[in-house]
Amino acid sequence: MAERKYFGTDGVRGKVGSFPITPDFALKLGWAAGKVLATHGSKKVLIGKDTRISGYMLESALEAGLTAAGLSAVFVGPMPTPAVAYLTRTFRAEAGVVISASHNPYDDNGIKFFSAEGTKLPDDVEEAIEALLEQPMDCVESAELGKASRINDAAGRYIEFCKSTFPTSLSLEGYKIVVDCAHGATYHIAPSVLRELGAEIIEIGTKPNGLNINEKCGATDIEALRHKVLEIGADVGLAYDGDGDRIMMVDHLGNKVDGDQILYIIARETLRAGHLKGGVVGTLMSNMSLEIALKQLGIPFLRANVGDRYVLEKMQENGWKLGGENSGHIIILDKNTTGDGIIASLAVLTAMAQHKLSLHELTGAVKLFPQVLINVRFAGGENPLNSEKVKAVAAEVEQRLAGKGRILLRKSGTEPLIRVMVECEDAVLAQKSAEEIAEAVKNS
């Protein structure tokens, strides 16, 4: 596979106004993608975005590029990333585009593509697009230019799809739910889904102004959600991130329920229903208690590299249907082709309604082990993880933790940092062990 110049693991991303997140690059990217995709079928590309102010600029530039290449641009407006994947499939579009930087601040943005099936573009298609980005732009004949249109009921279509994943025999009548949409792409979707299923909804993070996405709210900052749940005595709190592919939850006591615990609840319910195909995929950062709890249910568990892309790859390699990250990306392939915060939250709410149990009771089997993370900066040059001294200290700590904890040492891919993670039932031992390894890295 050729080295990527523009496409990262999650499309093209960066600071707005700095290359490559500029209108001229978006125009060229739309044109290059259009040229490659125009050789296929429907000649329609669906474009969705989150609520960042820069989305207007970037979608207009993409539209110009796509139509110049002979493809039609179909806008769905602010829409969660998983909704774009779903609508791309059902609309029979040639591809889908999401303009979002997920959980990042408002002045970042990104552009990523979905295939006609609602999955990541194949490597050879991305490579063909990158190759064209190096070529001068041209324009098709006037009669072959693409058009621009809008799906006015896109939100309604996705709301109905989300509701269809919740059993018709159940209702959320009687539940008081706080929903935090991070002033992001779920702001007009999630509250409607939950209200239509019968719940009483209290909204926070549903007033986007283009500049406030993810600001002290959403899946990456649940303090406002926790406060509101406790203040009004809600049954549960749900926090989505800016583009709606992550979910974090808060139980009625104000405890955070993360992606590992959510994954466990969904795995157990899927097993009980007789629908679990194979096992569950987590990541190197998944809590050891998740692995132990799944093992007690007889559910196989595999770890992928950190990143929902790698989780999905390992799921596909093994033919499994369920995976996720502790950060709240939960992928249920029986329901959607990518991480979907709303659908994952509905799966947990199904378990609550089905068994008449609180979220706190459902998470009882997964008592998360304390995790200590220390970032150690080094001077560059030789990788400290190759040092015999570091290896010896790490081996000693591993022996000490055998059966009751684990360590993970990773070199950052973007800066001279070694990330030291120690996880153990005993928080004091975890802290002491992490500091020991960090000290060895510093002195290597």
From Swiss-Prot:
Entry keyword annotation includes Metal-binding = yes
The Phosphoserine modification is found at 102
Q: What is this protein called?
A: Phosphoglucosamine mutase
- From the UniProt record, give one GO term of the biological process aspect: carbohydrate metabolic process
Q: CDD domains in the record, alphabetically? A: GlmM (cd05802)
Cofactors (names): Mg(2+)
Report the EC code(s) recorded for this entry: 5.4.2.10
List, alphabetically, the PROSITE patterns matched: PGM_PMM (PS00710)
Alphabetically ordered keywords of this record: Isomerase, Magnesium, Metal-binding, Phosphoprotein
A cellular-component GO term for this protein: cytosol
